[in-house]
UniProtKB/Swiss-Prot annotation:
Post-translational modification: Dually phosphorylated on Thr-171 and Tyr-173, which activates the enzyme. Phosphorylation is induced by osmotic stress and the presence of the antifungal agent iprodione.
Family assignment from sequence similarity: Belongs to the protein kinase superfamily. Ser/Thr protein kinase family. MAP kinase subfamily. HOG1 sub-subfamily.
PROSITE patterns: MAPK, PROTEIN_KINASE_ATP, PROTEIN_KINASE_DOM, PROTEIN_KINASE_ST
Job of this protein: Proline-directed serine/threonine-protein kinase involved in a signal transduction pathway that is activated by changes in the osmolarity of the extracellular environment. Controls osmotic regulation of transcription of target genes.
Top-rank EC class of the record's enzyme: transferase
Location of the protein in the cell: Cytoplasm; Nucleus
Organism: Cochliobolus heterostrophus
UniProt GO cellular component terms: cytoplasm; nucleus
Name used for this protein in its record: Mitogen-activated protein kinase HOG1
Amino acid sequence: MAEFVRAQIFGTTFEITSRYTDLQPVGMGAFGLVCSAKDQLTNQAVAVKKIMKPFSTPVLSKRTYRELKLLKHLRHENIISLSDIFISPLEDIYFVTELLGTDLHRLLTSRPLEKQFIQYFLYQILRGLKYVHSAGVVHRDLKPSNILVNENCDLKICDFGLARIQDPQMTGYVSTRYYRAPEIMLTWQKYDVEVDIWSAGCIFAEMLEGKPLFPGKDHVNQFSIITELLGTPPDDVIQTICSENTLRFVQSLPKRERQPLANKFKNAEPDAVDLLENMLVFDPRKRVRAEQALAHPYLAPYHDPTDEPVADEKFDWSFNDADLPVDTWKIMMYSEILDYHNVDAAVPEQENNGS
């Protein structure tokens, strides 16, 4: 039986196994507090994420289960990887992952990025997205703060708590506004992997300029800023809006012409602007895919089609439509954690049945 120790971090109790020491707060991730720690077993620095009250509601339970399943399934150099997971005696869940020194948000607010770093970071983002999308997963919340970077400029995408299946009828309020694709913001009829490409395009633009490309104060202002640069959406795109209120709003706006991005990004080389033009397209059907973007001349210094893997198999989303009580999610979660640790998942159920 693992020995647990307690520590107070920002008024929050961290109850972790004695394997992890020297806890220091790093920040808030999606739905949890993250600390750095030292792994006594490997002597490596790790990130420990506490999921707050994962069994308080069915929605939270399902969200935590989804993140756990995704972290277990997604294995790629540019995706954060799970190194340990446990449930504390207080029934909080802790994900342990590798620790990277900083994130893209902190880098972008500290200094301008040189061209080779912009290229290498964008390449790694798209390499990760190619893999994620091939697994049938859409991240949905890609932004600089959940793109982690270490001192070797290795980049890893994290925070898959909001990730969803590729679903023709996706709806909902997700990503941080500045990086949110118009089809999410305006409740388009459907959205898919292309929303991540839009977000990656916004991040690319921010790396080039040193500031957010579309810093909207609210949804209306956000859409207005986008149309100032990219023009009014084409009619066939507008017709896919399923909310009547949104449709009326878009149709009421003055017609605007798309501005050449070369005018906006005067210091960027033509190849960079061309790739950005292909990423920031209103019509998701015409937006470049990750695999195509990787082959763009701008990324030629890093592109290697033999080293840009896809997932071995699609992620199993069968649980995602399930409307289950907390206790059922809890049993499923325990089963996944035991499976991760290669323990026979039937044991606790038999014990429960016998008690």
